Design a protein with these regions (language model features):
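C-terminal outer-membrane/trafficking sorting elements
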Residues: 5, 18, 502-533, 541-585, ...
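Inhibitory N-terminal propeptides of secreted protease zymogens
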Residues: 20-145
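Subtilisin-like serine protease catalytic core
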Residues: 21, 38, 169-170, 179-222, ...
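N-terminal domain-start motif of subtilase-like serine proteases
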Residues: 83-87, 99-103, 127-195, 205, ...
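Substrate-binding/access-modulating region of protease and related hydrolase catalytic domains
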Residues: 182, 187-189, 248-251, 264-363, ...
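Catalytic-core environment of secreted peptidases
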Residues: 211-216, 369-421
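Hydrolase catalytic cores
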Residues: 263-269, 294, 398-460
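Pro/Thr/Ser/Gly-rich low-complexity, intrinsically disordered linker/stalk tracts
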Residues: 472-500, 561-577
Length: 665
C-alpha cells in the first residue's frame, strides 16, 4: 500500500493556487462561547470515554471540547461553503469550496487563524502515487476446513491442544504465542477496536464475519469521505484487514481477537491522494474517542501525494509535524492504543523508504512486516523516523498473511497493512486480561516481550512480541506479597490475578534439603480472571536457631506452564520440633490431603484410615515408622464434597482422630 502524510502547517502552498483546490482546513483561534463545559463531559463524551480517562488518570481539558458551534454557524453563512467535518483536538474545520471570495471572507473572520488547501479535483490522468495505493498481493489458499473439522487437534502448523481450531492462520498467531492468551479465554472480549481504512466491501454478508454480526459486535460504521453512514460498498482493503482480527471460521481462519467489538470508519479515498484524508482520519479518531473506543487499528499512511507540494520530506516525518500524526498522538494521549502500519516502501531507493505518517508518531505503535519464520519482509518500511526515534516499534506477520476473501475463504496477502491488525488483535486480548493498566503500560510490556528488545534495529524495531512473556510480566506487576515469622510459624500472604483453573504451589527449602519441597497447593478462587488474596501458615517441624529457610511461590497458569512469583528467606530464632503431634494440610481441602505425624517412639503397626461419616473406609495405609516425622499424602480426587474422619492408630490404639472437610472445586 502507498503511505502518505501531510504537515499541519500547509500555508507554504502558493496563495495564488488556492482557487484550484476544493477543500480547505480552517484553523480556529479558540473555542469561545462554547455551549459545552469541561465540568460536564457527559454532553460530549460517552460514559465509556469518561471511564477510560478516569481509569488512566487523564484529565478532561479544552481539547476535549467540541469546536464552538457559534463559529460553525458563522462559517455556514458564507455562500458556496459546506462544512465536511471538524477536529476538536486540532480546533479546525474542514470545508468544501472553490470560491476564492468565500475563502477571503472566512480568512477575514476574527476567530480564524488561517485557511489551508487539502484537496483538489482529481486528475483523470494516471498517477504513480495513486497506482501504488493498496498494492498488496492477494493469493488464494487451499481450504483446510474439511481436514481440521474432522480432527480438532490437527492445526495448520502441526500444533495441538488449543481451544481454537485456527486452520490456515495458526502460524501467524503462534509466532507471538498468541494462542496462549486464547487458551486462557482472552479473545478480545469487552475491548472495542476502531478500524480506519478505505472501505470494508461486503463485510455485511461475508461469512467470515457471521459471528461478529450475529452478536451485534460491529457497533457502528461511518464514511468520512462521503459523509454517509455506510462503509460496506467501498474499497475491499479494510475488509481484508478486519478479517485478520474478527474472522471466526474454525478450521479455516480465526482472527486474533474474534470476540472484540468494532467500529468501522472510511477515511481514505482510494481513487486519489490528498491531505484531506488525514483530516478525515483525525475526525474519525475523535469520533472513536467520544464513543469509548479502546484501540485504533489503522492500515493507512501518508508520505507522497498527487501534488508533490503536499509531500512530507523525511525530516518532516518526525512525529510532530503531520496533521494525522498529531491527531494519532492525541488519540494515545486520550488513553487509546493507536496501532498503525509502518509502510510498504522499504525497497524505495530514497528517503521515502522510511516510515510514513502517522507511524512516525511518538505514541503510535508502528508495525513492520515479517514472514511466519520471522524474516523481515523486504517491502517493510525502515526506521528511524525523521527525528531519529526508533521505528518500527514491533513487527508481525505481513508477508503471506492469511486473510479472508470476499466469500470468507482463506487467502493470503502481503503488506504491513496486514501485519498491523494481526498483532493489534493480540494486544486487545492482552488488554482484556489486564484492563487495569494504561494504554502505554500495555504497549511497554508488549515491546519488552519482543525478541530484539535489548538490541533493537531500524528494520525490526524491538522485534517480534511474545504474548506469553508479556502476560507473565503483567502478572508479576499485579502480584504483591508479605511474609511474617513468629517462632516456628511462618505466615505468607499474597494477592495475585487468577481463575479457578489456576493453582499456587508453595515450596520450602531448609538448609538440610537438597531442593525445594512442596508445602501446600492452593487453587484459584474465582471464575473470572481477577485479583484474589491468599494466606498460608507454615508450621515448621524441624529447624535450629539462625537456620535460614527459603520459601518459593509458583503460580500454575496452565497445566504445563508456571511462573515463580515470589521468593523470600526467613531466619529461625528457636528450635522447631513436631513432637507427638499431627499436622494436616490443608483443611478444608479440595485436592490431596498432606499430613505429618510426629512421634518420639517407633510405631511398629501404623494404620492410617479415612472414613466417611457413615463409617465406610475410603482409604487405608498400613506400615511402620521410626522415631521422628512421618509424611503421607492421601489422594482425594474421587471424594465428594463433605466431612470425613482421619484416624491414625498404633495397632488398635488411636493416636489421633481428626475431622476433615472437602470443599467443592
Amino acid at each position: 500500500m502507498k503511505f502518505c502524510c501531510v504537515s499541519i502547517c500547509l500555508v507554504f502552498l502558493y496563495t495564488g493556487l488556492k482557487g484550484q483546490y476544493t477543500s480547505h482546513i480552517v484553523q480556529l483561534k479558540d473555542k469561545a462561547n462554547n455551549v459545552h463545559k469541561i465540568q460536564d463531559p457527559t454532553t460530549f463524551l460517552s460514559a465509556k470515554a469518561i471511564d477510560r480517562r478516569a481509569k488512566q488518570h487523564i484529565n478532561i481539558d479544552s481539547t476535549d471540547l467540541p469546536v464552538s458551534q457559534s463559529y460553525l454557524d458563522i462559517i455556514r453563512t458564507v455562500p458556496g461553503v459546506n462544512i465536511l467535518n471538524t477536529s476538536r483536538w486540532l480546533n479546525q474545520v474542514l470545508i468544501n469550496t472553490t470560491d476564492a471570495a468565500s475563502l477571503a471572507t472566512i480568512n477575514a473572520f476574527e476567530f480564524v487563524v488561517s485557511t489551508s488547501p487539502v484537496a483538489a479535483i482529481a486528475n483523470p490522468r494516471p498517477n504513480n502515487i495513486i497506482n501504488r495505493k493498496f498494492e498488496e498481493t492477494i493469493t488464494p489458499l487451499p481450504d483446510r476446513s474439511l481436514i481440521n473439522e474432522r480432527n480438532h487437534q490437527r492445526q495448520a502448523g502441526g500444533e495441538t491442544g488449543n481451544t481454537i481450531n485456527y486452520g490456515n492462520n495458526f502460524k501467524q498467531i503462534h509466532i507471538h504465542e498468541g494462542e496462549f492468551l486464547h487458551n486462557l479465554g482472552f479473545t478480545g472480549r469487552n475491548i472495542t477496536m476502531a478500524f480506519m481504512d478505505a472501505g470494508f466491501l461486503g463485510f455485511k454478508t461475508n461469512p467470515a464475519f457471521d459471528s461478529v454480526r450475529l452478536q451485534n459486535r460491529i457497533l457502528g460504521e461511518y464514511d468520512f469521505v462521503n459523509n454517509e453512514p455506510s462503509v460496506n460498498e467501498d474499497h475491499i482493503h479494510g475488509m481484508y484487514c478486519l478479517s485478520t482480527v474478527a474472522s471466526n471460521r474454525p478450521g479455516s481462519i480465526v482472527g486474533t481477537a474474534p470476540h472484540a467489538n468494532f467500529w468501522l470508519f472510511r477515511t481514505e479515498d482510494a481513487s486519489t491522494e490528498f491531505p484531506i484524508e488525514e483530516q478525515n482520519w483525525a475526525a474519525a479518531a475523535e469520533f472513536a474517542d467520544s464513543a469509548g473506543v479502546d484501540m485504533i487499528s489503522s492500515s493507512l499512511g501518508y508520505a507522497q501525494f498527487v501534488n508533490p507540494a503536499f509531500n512530507h520530506a523525511y525530516d518532516q516525518r518526525d512525529g510532530n509535524t503531520a496533521l494525522i500524526t498529531i491527531a494519532a498522538d492525541m488519540a494515545a494521549k486520550k488513553g487509546m492504543i493507536v496501532m498503525n502500519s509502518a509502510g510498504n516502501s522499504g525497497g524505495a531507493g530514497n528517503d521515502f523508504r522510511f516510515v510514513s505518517c502517522p507511524a512516525d508518531g511518538d505514541s503510535v505503535v508502528a508495525v513492520g512486516a515479517v514472514d511466519v519464520d520471522g524474516n523481515i519482509a523486504e517491502f517493510s518500511s525502515w526506521g528511524p523516523n525523521g527525528a531519529g526515534k526508533l521505528k518500527p516499534n514491533i513487527v508481525s506477520v505481513g508477508q503471506g498473511t492469511v486473510l479472508a476473501n470476499t466469500v470468507g475463504a482463506a487467502t493470503s496477502g502481503n503488506g504491513t497493512s496486514f501485519s498491523n491488525p494481526n498483532i493489534a488483535g493480540l494486544i486487545a486480548c492482552l488488554w482484556q486480561a489486564f484492563p487495569e493498566y494504561s494504554n502505554m503500560q500495555i504497549i511497554d510490556e508488549v515491546q519488552k516481550s519482543a525478541h530484539k528488545f535489548s538490541t533493537p534495529d531500524d528494520r525490526y524495531g524491538y522485534g517480534i512480541p511474545n504474548f506469553k512473556k508479556a502476560f507473565y510480566s503483567l502478572l508479576h506487576r499485579s502480584f504483591a506479597a508479605s511474609v511474617s515469622s513468629a517462632g516456628c510459624t511462618t505466615t505468607i500472604e499474597w494477592t495475585s490475578k487468577d481463575t479457578r483453573s489456576m493453582r499456587y504451589i508453595l515450596e520450602r527449602k531448609m538448609e538440610s534439603d537438597t531442593g525445594f519441597v512442596k508445602v501446600a497447593t492452593l487453587d484459584g478462587k474465582t471464575d473470572s480472571f481477577k485479583l484474589n488474596t491468599y494466606s498460608y501458615k507454615d508450621v515448621l517441624i524441624s529447624g535450629s536457631p539462625n537456620e535460614q529457610v527459603v520459601y518459593r511461590l509458583k503460580q500454575n497458569v496452565t497445566a504445563d506452564t508456571s511462573v515463580i512469583l515470589y521468593t523470600t528467606t526467613i531466619q529461625l530464632t528457636e528450635i522447631c520440633s513436631l513432637g507427638d503431634r499431627l499436622i494436616v494440610r490443608p483443611n478444608p481441602f479440595q485436592n490431596d490431603i498432606n499430613f505429618v505425624l510426629g512421634s518420639s517412639t517407633a510405631i511398629s503397626k501404623l494404620s492410617v484410615s479415612l472414613t466417611d461419616m457413615g463409617g465406610r473406609t475410603l482409604y487405608r495405609y498400613e506400615g511402620s515408622t521410626l522415631p521422628g516425622n512421618f509424611y503421607l499424602s492421601i489422594p482425594t480426587q474421587s471424594l465428594s464434597a463433605g466431612m470425613y474422619i482421619l484416624t491414625i492408630r498404633d495397632s488398635k490404639k488411636i493416636l489421633h482422630s481428626r475431622k476433615l472437610v472437602k470443599q467443592s472445586l
